[in-house]
């Protein structure tokens, strides 16, 4: 990985020099509040309003669980500077299963018949079964877990990883510009990228679908293969140009790009989910999505 998380001593060495941060860490409470509101706003008159509102319920359950059962201080010494919370090597705390139980309890009273059946399955699953499904998701074997269960398991895992990311040093530096497709904190995939305003005006940051961190990647470069050639920007129409798809003809992938200057309330997970018709258009053109939304998992293999 090409972005390094700095130790306390390294932070002091660079304290007097300013450069745009390579990694931005989320404010958990603010993130969930903004996301839930955005999902509910986008659900108005949307053809997929029911699912957007379901996603908002999940996010609000994450916020409620965060407030009721925050992650205790973790033993996070001797972590790697590169991807310190790597999903494949970091030993997670079993508290994530408590988070899953609390999220399910929050959603159950308003669940329809299909969602209620999924909740019942997860409630009856053994610890070993839950951990096995979590392992498959965290190693990106998404097609081995049914999408209805994956949404809930990922919501609990993400709540855990988001809080763990608050307990590591928050300074970072770019080592080089290669291999920036995966999150430098946990190694997971991006949801989308955001072109920011404010102190980071015009800079593009990719948003992690697990620990919710964001990392800088220069524009006019493929977020998947680093190619600078054969890049094109697409939108369904100019009115919806807030959310665009950047395609790469070299690796035939795409990832959405969002622009805060067009709407400061744009939110990567919510706006990505609400613009699913752009995904359909890109797939019809032969491009494969290079990121993953925590509310849209691939179908399970039969």
Swiss-Prot record:
Chief subcellular location: cytoplasm
Gene3D superfamilies: FdhE-like domain
Xref: SUPFAM superfamilies: FdhE-like (SSF144020)
Xref: CDD domains: FdhE
UniProt GO MF annotations: ferric iron binding
InterPro entries, per the entry: FdhE-like_sf, FdhE_C, FdhE_central, FdhE_N, Formate_DH_accessory
Pfam (any one): FdhE_C
A biological process from GO: protein maturation
Keyword NAD: no
Gene Ontology cellular component list: cytosol
Keywords carried by this UniProt record: Cytoplasm
HAMAP family assigned: FdeH
Protein purpose: Necessary for formate dehydrogenase activity.
Family assignment from sequence similarity: Belongs to the FdhE family.
Protein name stated in the entry: Protein FdhE homolog
Species name: Haemophilus influenzae (strain PittGG)
Gene behind the chain: fdhE
């Amino acid at each position: 990985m090409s972005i390094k998380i700095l130790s306390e001593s390294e932070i002091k060495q660079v304290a007097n020099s300013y450069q745009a941060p390579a990694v931005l860490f989320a404010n958990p409470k603010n993130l969930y509040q903004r996301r839930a509101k955005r999902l509910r706003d986008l659900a108005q008159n949307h053809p997929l309003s029911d699912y957007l509102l379901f996603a908002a319920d999940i996010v609000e359950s994450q916020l409620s669980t965060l407030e009721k059962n925050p992650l205790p201080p973790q033993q996070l010494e001797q972590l790697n500077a590169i991807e310190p919370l790597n999903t494949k090597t970091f030993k997670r705390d079993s508290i994530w299963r408590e988070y899953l139980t609390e999220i399910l309890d929050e959603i159950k009273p308003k669940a329809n018949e299909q969602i209620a059946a999924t909740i019942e399955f997860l409630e009856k699953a053994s610890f070993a079964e839950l951990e096995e499904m979590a392992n498959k998701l965290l190693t990106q074997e998404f097609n081995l877990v049914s999408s209805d269960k994956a949404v809930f398991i990922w919501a609990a895992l993400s709540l855990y990883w988001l809080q763990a990311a608050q307990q590591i040093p928050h300074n970072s530096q770019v080592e080089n510009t290669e291999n920036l497709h995966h999150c430098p904190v946990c190694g997971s995939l991006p949801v989308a990228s955001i072109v920011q305003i404010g102190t980071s005006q015009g800079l593009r940051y990719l948003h992690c679908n697990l620990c919710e961190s964001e990392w800088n990647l220069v524009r006019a470069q493929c977020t998947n293969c680093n190619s600078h050639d054969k890049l094109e920007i697409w939108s369904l129409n100019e009115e919806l140009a807030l959310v665009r798809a950047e395609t790469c003809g070299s690796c035939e992938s795409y990832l959405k790009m969002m622009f805060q200057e067009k709407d400061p309330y744009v939110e990567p997970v919510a706006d990505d989910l609400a613009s699913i018709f752009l995904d359909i258009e890109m797939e019809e053109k032969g491009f494969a999505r290079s990121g993953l939304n925590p509310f849209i998992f691939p179908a399970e293999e039969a």
